[in-house]
Amino acid sequence: MQGKCWFLENKALKPFVCFYGGDQFLYIGDRIVSYFSTNDLYVALRGRIDKDLSLSRKVELYNGECVYLFCEHPAVGIVNTDFKLEIH
């Protein structure tokens, strides 16, 4: 299936891809792609680079949606760096 991801980083041999989705499905463009198991879930990048990126991390958000991170190597952690701390 061809589609566009939410985010693609393609810096010198360290590509990774992020998709939005939910429990057992991903949004690819305007399509919903469901899956049964995350064990064999991967993204095949074809074009300027030819790489298969496996699912490294699935992050569940507070609203029930998920962010899926695909990359070549395991992700140690994901940190939210866009927050504001207000002290009253």
From Swiss-Prot:
InterPro entries tied to this protein: a/bCoV_VIROPORIN_3A-like_CD, Coronavirus_Orf3a/b
Superkingdom classification of source: Viruses
Positions of the CoV 3a-like viroporin CD domain: 1-75
Family, as annotated: Belongs to the coronaviruses NS4b protein family.
Protein name: Non-structural protein 4b
Species of the source: Human coronavirus 229E (HCoV-229E)
